[in-house]
Structure formats: structure tokens, C-alpha cells
Amino acid sequence: MPEKPDQRAAVVCRGVRGATTAEANQREEILTATRQLLALLIRQNNIQPADIASAIFSTTPDLNAEFPALAARQLGWLEVPLLCTHEANVPGSLQKCIRVMVHWNTDKPQNEIVHVYIKEATRLRPDLSQLPPVDWDELEAWITEHTER
């Protein structure tokens, strides 16, 4: 029996936030850190590329060796509109930081969205940094499996 329209969860566009840090201003460091961040966002929220409306990436001004959005393309986000920008250069703020805001079409309520803050970026949102321990080797294997060649 088909569901009545009022029984289905509405699909809305939700913001999913995340941040990480890179070890150095080097192309591969930026891409690796961004892929790790995106992989955790994808896995924690069960995000499918077809459900992503857009994503905005920002880096602190000390990271300019590569566009972090390239990491999303490498993970198969080929049709997703992506934008990169720099964060405001606020004295004393976290350095070598990559942030992302993913606009995701989902039926999940806001309180079920998992925001991901890892590495040094955990200090930006300690209230949202309570992920279970990350098995970095297993995560890298997942990234390798899901990276476009």
C-alpha cells in the first residue's frame, strides 16, 4: 500500500559542517586532509553524491598549494557544484585549516546530522568533536577504493 504524502519525511537541504588541518602547505597534504574529512562526513551521514546540492570549501590563507575541492572530485563528486574560498585572516586563529559546508538533500532531521571536526580542528567545535576513534588505515583504504582514477 503506498504511503500517504503526509507520512513521508520531507527532503530538505541541510548543512553539514566539517574541518580538519593539513600538516603543510603542500598539494598532497591538502588533498589527503580533505579526502579524509570528506570520507568521514560521507560515512558518518551516509551521504550519496547525487544528494549533494553543493559544497563550499575554505582554507586559511596559509594554504594555497591546491584547491581542496579537487579532493571531492577525486571521490566522485563530478556533478556537484563546488566553491573554494579563503577564511578571514583573524590573528590567533587556527592555521592550516580546511573547512567545508556541504549542502545535502536529505530527510534526516537536523539533530541527526553528524558534523566532523578532526585533527587540530577539534578545538574549533569541541561540542561536535566526539567522534569514535578513527582507524586511519581503514579510512585510507576506503578512500582508495572510492577515489576516481
Residue ranges and their predicted role:
Residues M1-R149:
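Terminal domain-initiation and capping elements
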